[in-house]
């Protein structure tokens, strides 16, 4: 294990380091000192940067010295829009298809999990995947879910667009021919009037979330363990901070209690800045008023801190982003209630973040802000930002800049780019969202994923999109003029997020006195071929000087975590994001493609459109192994 290599100096420095990472290619993110060969850490902060010789005097008898073996070291990543609290509470319940390269494999995982899931529990595939990632390039069918898990309820969420349920899940959810469609959603029915197992966001996603909420929840002990393991999974990719954007079915303070307790006991392995999101239409102003009277932005510490309100302030002002459906028309009069909410926050010193997908929504929101600006309420020193902003226009960006706003962009187009392209065309997709135009105006821009329900939480997939403009299926959406170079993109994932929370002096760069948050990468992000970027992981992640993730040569150096619980959890058996084995991956994809050809033959034979599949394949080959 490479944990030595600098001999202690004969005369110990009066302040020796707790940790030294040597023999590294350190990208600091600091324009004043962009590179180094070693980094020293003490008391959770960066003590010094230099080369191995420079830092030799900081090595004492108790110093842990890690040889990076020439690997790239970067500042810890910061996802500026991640539903980390909700994700943590559900992580061990979910079967993750993130990174799985074939539908055949995904369905095999489903069938295997059905064999261990106890009666009464559901199998949940909770987003983070797209058919474009599969060799077969298609969705699963309800029939395939029924075949894989005939008796165990299965709920498969596909982005914010749709969900598939097997027969057992339809029964468990209580859906019948008499169940009414929820507002903004559709329960698809067959000719007999019975639910088929397909749910559509048309365009609102409430039908998807409310159905998923019918599944059993974890008890508090398992919610705690689940959160610990989700944070460690994020650490696996070099994430050291995140801005939690709240979300539906995430109630304050009840659903925040787990992370509050982990912060109290010093067990968080990720720094979290969190927002508060009114949950019930018609009660938004009452919720916001109560919060402004009981808590304040800044409450907490460097590990867990309240940042403000959002990403929704009022439900009527939210435009949903199912690009398979037309842009939703918001109510003609939503501004009246929305103005009251924003006024309340600004008058009480609260910042906020605001979900806004379409420029049409952004322009209406900006008109409200400009009205309040005339009264001196903007910018007023309160941090505020738009989330998503896929179709924001240049003149709207100018208005955002004038009002002191910022933006958080995500790689939803990595997963939804195909349907966006189909609806709006190549010209619109080429600058969705217009990140280059944002940066050219000097706006603060931060990057994130919007995981776990749409994109995967893997930040390297998001970075790949920023530098290539390609979907996970390889479709090129953005021309070279709209792309970022690798250092620019990394800056959005480090310094950008720190600026949104006012922590740019201590976070997002490797500089003396800053938080000791860093990642030693499996491959050099700055030099590897573009197609390799999504496969990057961290082999050593340090947060506040603590080693919270260690792999490869460093396995065993990380802080201990409790076993995954419950024992039947999909995470206990499959882990989270599917691992890539590099060269072995090509062989696996070839196998998947071969299997998909067999699958197509089987489907054709079943429909009468092709030759019989033969006696060896009386059932779907996806489910026969």
Listing of model-derived features with the role each one plays in the protein:
Residues 1-2:
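N-terminal export leaders
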Residues 5-23, 27, 31-290, 303-361, ...:
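Divalent metal-binding segments
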Residues 17, 24, 48, 348, ...:
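In a subset of proteins, long, contiguous C-terminal domains/tails are tracked
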Residues 29, 128, 247, 389-390, ...:
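Flexible loop residues that form catalytic
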Residues 126, 157, 410, 519-522, ...:
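Residue-level recognition of conserved beta-strand edge/terminus positions
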Residues 297-300:
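Accessory "access/gating" subregions that flank catalytic or transport cores
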Residues 343-353, 357-384, 388-389, 394-398, ...:
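His/Asp/Glu-enriched, well-ordered alpha-helical/loop segment
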